[in-house]
Amino acid sequence: MEAEKVKCLIIGSGPAGYTAAIYAARANLSPVLYEGLQPGGQLTTTTDIENFPGYPEGISGTQMMEDLRKQAERFGADLRFGMATAADLSKSPYKITIDEEKVIEAQTVIIATGAAAKYLGLEDEKKYAGMGVSACATCDGFFYRKKVVAVVGGGDTACEEASYLAGLASKVYLIVRKPFLRASKIMQKRVMENEKIEVLFKHNAVGLYGDNGVEGVHLVKRMGEADEQRYDLAIDGFFLAIGHKPNSDIFKPYVDTDETGYILTEPGTPRTKVPGVFAAGDVADPHYRQAITAAATGCMAAIEAERFLLN
């Protein structure tokens, strides 16, 4: 099968991908965007977004992504369902395989594949997604003002999330599997000195319960030991802070990544080390992971693609 040739290929359909499509379409780059397995990305699992400028009453993640999608289509972006399964960025035009069969040859590529939150693997995690389970305290913490929440994890991210939530919630339980925190000393100190945070060392979360949302977590203290204890803890929100996995595997042979797989770009730009290949959104952002920062880098990537093609 002969490869399809395009000027600008965008891989991923969260705020980064859709914003890149809007800007690329307006620049007459005739962008083709493949939406992946979850059109709209992780934001479609967020019930309410209240921190994106321009939505004074808030908006659901699903509706925001649908609006961005329509806006991209309005300017002529070609949006398609399909997943990038292989990549050859060794030379231009760059070859991207979709669903293991169709090959696209692109003069420029914008990687906006995002990063997936790591889950514990509990049967109830997906059931309560958007109904008490979250992987982003900055995104969803506002909904738990004066409520009781639990954060799972023992590293810097977990401590940062717990500290942030302590400024909103009435009580924060930090559930730590090990008998110690892995976080930096300054973050450990911040957590241990916060009266609102109670650290539950040597605890495992093994399940969630609730009728119309999370009402509590099933815990095991000192799992596997002779004095193992099982009990339930009433909470209103359950925050996962055990890391994210960037969706960058197929690009790793060609672009630089950090030790966890986030694509490295030139500081202040979405440019990777491969000319004409750009990374936008959470796949290149281990720090902020916000809709607005993802959209901003999507814009930057499209502008860079336009400039690259002009030159």
Annotate each language-model stretch with its function.
Residues 79-142:
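Glycine/small-residue-rich loop that forms an oxyanion/phosphate-binding "nest" at active or ligand-binding sites
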Residues 5-7, 81, 145-147, 202, ...:
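Phosphate-coordination loops involved in phosphoryl transfer and adenosine-cofactor binding
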Residues 14-15, 38, 115-117, 156-157, ...:
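Residue-level detector of alpha-helix initiation sites
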Residues 6-75, 159-185, 258:
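Beta1-alpha1 glycine-rich phosphate/pyrophosphate-binding loop at the start
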Residues 163, 167-171, 292-311:
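Internal hydrophobic alpha-helix adjacent to the cofactor/substrate pocket in enzyme cavities
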Residues 72-98, 103-106, 167-267, 307-311:
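A Rossmann-like FAD-binding core segment of flavoenzymes
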Residues 116, 121, 126-143, 242-288, ...:
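FAD-site-proximal beta/loop scaffold in flavoenzymes
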